[in-house]
Amino acid sequence: MEKFKGNKVVLVGNGAVGSSYAFAMLNQGACDEFVIIDLNEDKAKGDAMDLNHGVVYAPSPMQVKYGTYEDCHDASLIVICAGAAQKPGETRLDLVGKNMKIFKSIVDEIMKSGFDGIFLIATNPVDVLTYAVQKFSGLPENQVIGSGTILDTARFRHLLSQEFNVSPNSVHGYIIGEHGDSELAVWSGTNIAGNSLYDILNENPEKQKLIEEIFVNTRDAAYEIIKAKGATYYGVAMGLMRISKAILNNENVVLTVSAKLNGEYGHDDVYIGVPAIINRNGIREVLETPLNTEEKEKFAKSVETLKAIQTPFFS
């Protein structure tokens, strides 16, 4: 689809995830102007210079610069990757207290600029912090999006593709719920090239035992990567890039993001990972993918987990 002209993206937080996202943006050429905001001014300026030197080989012209919160006033999209890092052995939800304070100050500064675009949140715990950004900013719910389970879904599709020796693009299935320990796989709706996974397993019963392993490996992938190299950033950066392109190119594509529920799935007042249609206005619509009884129960528990975390801050 045609790219809207005058696209401006602001990145807040130029750490491992943020800088990986910036590099992905340069390689995919989805915006015209890219601004980096970070407390470490020298690194942000250095990255802007480094990225600009690669523009000549990028698919489209893009201006990259270091900036301040004043640059947010005419941005189409602000991507927040700032916050305290997740440490080995620490769950995403352990981070909430530290990052809530950081986010309040960031969002206040952004809104002072007159910003009225779309927020895309990546910092963990992403569902709770996306909820916080909507509350802090006062923007309409459709204009505040979290990365949600977009990476979990990608991991899920990758692992299934490896097991069945097909392209991940031919694997269709979702991880929904909290981006964290209470997430769940929608096994009942998973298919490979239109063939129900349940039907495939009936024909290949020897693979049945591998299914739970695939989910566990999907859910716990971040912990394994953090143990090995200290942080995850390439995968989530690509997920952020996919959401960004859906917004900037007005794609109306379905992605599993953290979206606000208002009665969908029988729940409300929570941001959580669900399939949603994404376009230039942000979240056009939350889609209610069919769930079986067990999946509904697990999803309800995931909602409870997130509400228990956010309630002390927004009761």
Swiss-Prot record:
Kindly list the positions annotated as binding substrate. Answer: Q86, R92, N124, P125, V126, D127, D152, T153, A154, R155, T232
Enzyme category, top tier: oxidoreductase
Q: Catalytic activity, per the record?
A: (S)-lactate + NAD(+) = pyruvate + NADH + H(+)
Record's subcellular location: Cytoplasm
Q: Which GO terms describe its biological process?
A: glycolytic process; lactate metabolic process
Spell out the protein name for this chain: L-lactate dehydrogenase
Give the binding site residues for NAD(+).
V17, D38, K43, Y69, G83, A84, S105, A122, T123, N124, S147
Note the SUPFAM superfamilies from the entry.
Answer: LDH C-terminal domain-like (SSF56327), NAD(P)-binding Rossmann-fold domains (SSF51735)
> Could you give one GO CC term from the UniProt record?
cytoplasm
What does this chain do?
A: Catalyzes the conversion of lactate to pyruvate.
- Quote the EC number: 1.1.1.27
- Tell me which family the UniProt entry assigns to this protein: Belongs to the LDH/MDH superfamily. LDH family.
Per the UniProt record, the source organism is Macrococcus caseolyticus (strain JCSC5402)
Subunit info?
Homotetramer.
Keywords of the record: Allosteric enzyme, Cytoplasm, NAD, Oxidoreductase, Phosphoprotein
Gene Ontology molecular function terms on file: L-lactate dehydrogenase activity
